[in-house]
């Protein structure tokens, strides 16, 4: 059984408080009309884990009833968590924007004292960067000679293992990013509202780009909705040749949050339970990082969602950017090839029933049905190529 996105996504939905939803769902689970395999009600056919969260919903055999609507002000209070801490994980390679990025996220936070940074920073200026890190509250950096760690994912794992201290929420991003005002409280509020629909999840996307003018001033675009994922011709060709999915952003101006087939390396936001359940890997370097994270989160039962609202901006196409594969090809490409082989081996083993490198709450075949990416045949469905929302949430 599956839940179609259009069954769920209503921006005007009113929800009950979590305690009432949990009480309703516990009643449903004890009811003889409850189908345990699909979490549906035989009487109404609804998926009860979602229906029990809706304010206007009621049990078809009257075991629980609709609740009075919650005011927008009360709902905002419920979804806001002003005591929460956020850990920001950043890998950086010779990036002159790293400290501007850190300062921007501190300055724009509503609660900067609750923001914690863990940075793996590759740059020859080790003493300078260390001094910059200790100038700032809650900022820790592992300052390394370039080439010490090869790849974004191993660098993220290094930051996590050294610096993460059980913060409530987790923002994984790059060293060339900017934020909206009060990004911390806004993203937590949006995440908790979306969680009513998707349960535990990852917010992710290829966020809009910003630029810097010749005077060093940030140029932030007037874009308030995140792009969604689609596959360009080069992305399609790459998948056909390697079985490694890649995506490109497209501006579809969605009216709601959108189920995603993919995880962005430069932006994902989640809660601590997700990152503790699905840790980073040392086995992928760069290209395979995003599809592996998507598969790992998905097979662990964690949903992938692109939020409608923009919270952060990204500057990938910088004119002065340094790339390890250009500066250290002898070090990078052996690891790159090893990474590709690792990903391909995981796919082959998963198609033969193994969960090595993945998790067992959902299968790779569930992911194929969800995303339209057919590893088993090497084909791509039109819906994933065109960037339509992923098809359903498997139970």
Describe the residue ranges of each PLM region:
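Aromatic-residue-lined binding/catalytic grooves and analogous aromatic/hydrophobic interfacial grooves
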Residues: 387-392
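Membrane-interface aromatic/basic loop that binds lipid-linked glycans or pyrophosphate carriers
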Residues: 395
């Amino acid at each position: 059984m599956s839940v179609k996105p259009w069954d769920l996504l209503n921006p005007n939905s009113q929800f009950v408080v979590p305690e009432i939803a949990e009480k309703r769902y516990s009643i449903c689970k004890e009811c003889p009309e409850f189908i345990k395999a699909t979490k549906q009600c035989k009487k109404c056919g609804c998926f009860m884990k979602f229906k029990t969260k809706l304010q206007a919903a009621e049990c078809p055999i009257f075991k629980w009833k609709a609740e009075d609507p919650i005011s927008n002000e009360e709902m905002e209070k419920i979804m806001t968590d002003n005591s929460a801490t956020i850990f920001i994980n950043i890998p950086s390679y010779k990036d002159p924007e790293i400290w501007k990025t850190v300062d921007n996220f501190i300055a724009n936070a509503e609660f900067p004292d609750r923001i914690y940074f863990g940075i793996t920073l590759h740059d020859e200026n080790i003493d300078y960067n260390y001094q910059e890190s200790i100038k700032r509250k809650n900022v820790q950096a592992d300052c390394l000679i370039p080439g010490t760690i090869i790849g974004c994912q191993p660098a993220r794992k290094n930051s996590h293992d050294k610096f993460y201290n059980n913060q409530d929420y987790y923002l994984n991003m790059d060293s060339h990013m900017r934020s909206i005002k009060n990004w911390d409280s806004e993203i937590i509020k949006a995440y908790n509202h979306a969680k009513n629909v998707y349960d535990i999840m990852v917010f992710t996307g290829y966020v809009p780009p910003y630029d810097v003018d010749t005077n060093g001033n940030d140029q932030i675009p007037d874009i308030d909705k995140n792009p969604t994922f689609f596959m360009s011709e080069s992305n399609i060709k790459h998948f056909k040749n390697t079985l490694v999915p890649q995506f490109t952003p497209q501006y579809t101006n969605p009216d709601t949050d959108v189920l995603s087939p993919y995880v962005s390396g430069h932006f994902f936001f989640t809660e601590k339970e997700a990152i503790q359940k699905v840790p980073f890997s040392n086995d992928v370097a760069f290209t395979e990082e995003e599809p592996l994270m998507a598969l790992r989160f998905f097979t662990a039962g964690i949903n992938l969602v692109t939020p409608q609202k923009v919270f952060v901006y990204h500057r990938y196409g910088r004119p002065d950017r340094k790339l390890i594969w250009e500066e250290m090809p002898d070090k990078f490409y052996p690891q790159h090839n090893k990474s590709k082989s690792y990903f391909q081996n995981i796919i082959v083993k998963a198609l033969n029933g193994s969960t090595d490198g993945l998790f067992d709450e959902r299968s790779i075949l569930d992911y194929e049905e969800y995303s339209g990416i057919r590893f088993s045949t090497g084909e791509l469905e039109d819906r994933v190529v065109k960037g339509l929302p992923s098809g359903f949430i498997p139970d």
